[in-house]
């Protein structure tokens, strides 16, 4: 385009800038000592302070008549500007102690107190603790001589931790500028605040059993129970009270419990060749125990989720699709009682029993080593996880949104056309509703990493009198995925798929040298 092309004075120009600085100061003191050669102690005291500050501005104007006039001041029409700043800080004091008796019994404890600027002045400090104990059964007199048992440990722990991850300043009542009423500039109340905001707390309990055999096979079992209380949530409130329709509060109780299993071992191990396999699997159950003010259910209208006491917080709340009426091509749904109807009603939504957070997940891998050559592969999988495919909803919407662009070819080939057609795509002209037909199983199996490397033998490197290690390697990530999900990638970070970029395939070649 010519530099002075006519644009009828519709050009725009903007300038923006932002700066952020994060300062962290940490001081620790550590003391180790032993008594009678059998009691070992390790004590640490510490303090940490964190301060974050950011500020920025933006200026925007309209009416530039040439692309050579790039300054904001060259605009002939009204400009708009905005600036912002944000700060938060933490202050922490902590201590940790460890005890070891003859490498048979181990104990540890920790205690910390933290202050966050994100809470009201009377609730900024939170105190958290942990206790742990481990019994090294293998070191007992009756097991230490058993050569076939290389590891036997039992561990238990309990403790609390805190969470303060909410936006800055939400404990404050704020006003904002830029308001205009009857051509008079002024301020308006933009946030109601809550000086009672404080730390969210999680109480965690763990049990672990670790076994090893013949110095080549290892098993691990862990069970846990976590209870989170005083959760930081946006609680709905009347607009007449807050002006926003919600307020941040400490409410509710949520529980998670589950198990984790892992195993690895050398199937074959000789001087020159080793074949190792490993696998892990975990199961987690999430349940909401309490909400707020005696409320037992709350609908999150933007996510298709409904928080119901006794259910998972990631369970979908949707209408159930019953297919297409073969006589006339109309959409059908199940009502709340399971009867088929051609009316779509919000009141017929039900808890589906399907969740975004997968209860089952795990991985497995194998590696081969022959002299300096090594090949390894790592897989990951997720089971029984569901995601709303929002792309499919739009691609099969027909005329729902007033346009028929970018539609799936299923609307052409698979839709209902005449009485007697059996299909799940309704006749043309039906208004598509967001229901559980678009709730897809996003379980998958993925090859996360494949690597091949070769290390030159030491006998050759010694002759160079220069290199102590030379390793040539190549690796690939995310080579393939097995899934029934219709989107580009089942491993999305939210419960709604909206054409997010899939995990990229990555290939790496390299040489590692040591001198």
Q: Predicted regions span which residues?
A:
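Extracellular/periplasmic, surface-exposed regions of secreted and cell-surface proteins
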Residues: 1, 5-309, 371, 434, ...
């Amino acid at each position: 385009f010519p530099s002075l092309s006519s644009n009828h004075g519709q050009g725009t120009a903007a300038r923006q800038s932002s700066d952020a600085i994060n300062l962290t100061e940490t001081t620790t003191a550590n003391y180790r000592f032993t008594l009678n050669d059998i009691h070992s102690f390790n004590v640490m005291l510490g303090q940490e302070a964190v301060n974050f500050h950011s500020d920025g501005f933006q200026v925007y104007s309209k009416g530039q008549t040439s692309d050579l006039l790039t300054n904001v001041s060259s605009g002939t029409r009204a400009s708009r500007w905005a600036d912002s700043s944000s700060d938060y800080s933490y202050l922490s004091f902590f201590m940790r102690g460890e005890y070891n008796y003859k490498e048979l019994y181990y104990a540890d404890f920790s205690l910390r107190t933290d202050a966050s600027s994100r809470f009201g002045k009377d609730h900024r400090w939170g105190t958290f603790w942990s206790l742990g104990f481990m019994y090294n059964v293998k070191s007992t007199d009756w097991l230490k001589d058993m050569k076939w048992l290389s590891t036997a440990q039992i561990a238990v722990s309990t403790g609390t931790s805190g969470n303060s991850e909410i936006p800055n300043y939400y404990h404050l009542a704020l006003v904002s500028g830029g308001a205009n009423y009857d051509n008079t500039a002024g301020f308006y109340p933009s946030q109601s605040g809550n000086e009672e905001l404080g730390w969210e707390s999680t109480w965690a309990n763990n049990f672990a059993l670790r076994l090893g055999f013949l110095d080549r096979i290892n098993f691990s079992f862990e069970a846990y129970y976590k209870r989170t209380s005083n959760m930081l949530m946006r609680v709905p409130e009347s607009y007449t009270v807050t002006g926003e329709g919600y307020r941040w509060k400490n409410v509710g109780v949520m529980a998670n419990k589950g198990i984790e299993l892992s195993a690895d071992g050398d199937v074959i191990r000789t001087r020159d060749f080793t074949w190792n396999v490993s696998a892990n699997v975990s199961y987690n159950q999430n349940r909401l125990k309490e909400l707020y003010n005696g409320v037992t259910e709350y609908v999150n209208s933007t996510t298709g989720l409904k928080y119901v006491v006794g259910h998972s917080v990631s369970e979908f709340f949707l209408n159930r699709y019953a297919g297409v009426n073969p006589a006339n091509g109309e959409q059908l749904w199940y009502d709340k009682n399971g009867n088929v109807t051609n009316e779509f009603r919000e009141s017929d939504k039900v808890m589906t029993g399907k969740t975004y957070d997968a209860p089952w997940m795990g991985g497995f891998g194998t590696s081969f080593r022959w002299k300096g050559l090594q090949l390894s592969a790592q897989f990951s999988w997720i089971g029984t996880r569901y995601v709303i495919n929002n792309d499919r909803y739009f691609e099969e919407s027909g005329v729902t949104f007033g346009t028929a662009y970018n539609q799936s070819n299923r609307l052409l080939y698979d839709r209902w056309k005449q009485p007697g057609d059996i299909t799940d795509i309704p006749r043309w002209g039906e208004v598509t509703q967001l229901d559980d037909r678009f709730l897809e199983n996003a379980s998958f199996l993925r090859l996360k990493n494949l690597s091949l490397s070769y290390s030159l033998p030491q006998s050759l490197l010694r002759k160079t009198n220069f290199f102590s290690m030379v390793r040539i390697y190549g690796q690939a990530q995310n080579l393939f995925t097995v899934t029934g999900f219709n989107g580009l990638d089942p491993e999305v970070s939210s419960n709604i798929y909206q054409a997010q970029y899939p995990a990229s395939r990555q290939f790496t070649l390299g040489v590692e040298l040591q001198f």
